[in-house]
Design a protein with these regions (language model features):
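Conserved functional hotspots at enzyme active or ligand-binding sites that engage polyanionic ligands
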Residues: 1-103
Length: 103
């Protein structure tokens, strides 16, 4: 959880964010130990700010973690580990996800 991976998101349909891009792993390690899938949130440098998008600076570029585009992917889509987000960014991301999925 909190690692940034380069991930191949293609093929996609409609408004799903596409191409190979950095993504943040948001699922916990306990899931990774038993499943062949991980839950990720794509990153972008071109999107618009919103309450469900967390600002991030990675590799000298400002961007957003797109929590509105989370998805489960097979580990075969993982291309390369690029680093990790800060604890502050991870905490903000998990807070938004919790607010999204709890009544």
């Amino acid at each position: 959880r909190g690692d940034i991976w380069l991930i191949n998101l293609d093929p996609t349909i409609g408004s799903e964010i596409k191409k190979t891009r950095p993504c943040v792993v948001v699922s916990p390690q306990e899931m990774h130990d038993f499943l062949r899938t991980v839950i990720i949130a794509p990153m972008t440098t071109k999107g618009r700010s919103a309450s469900y998008r967390v600002p991030i600076t990675h590799d000298g570029k400002k961007g957003l973690v797109l929590l509105d585009q989370i998805r489960t992917i097979d580990k075969a889509r993982l291309v390369k580990r690029l680093g990790a987000i800060s604890n502050k960014t991870l905490g903000a991301s998990l807070d938004i996800l919790q607010a999204t999925f709890t009544p």
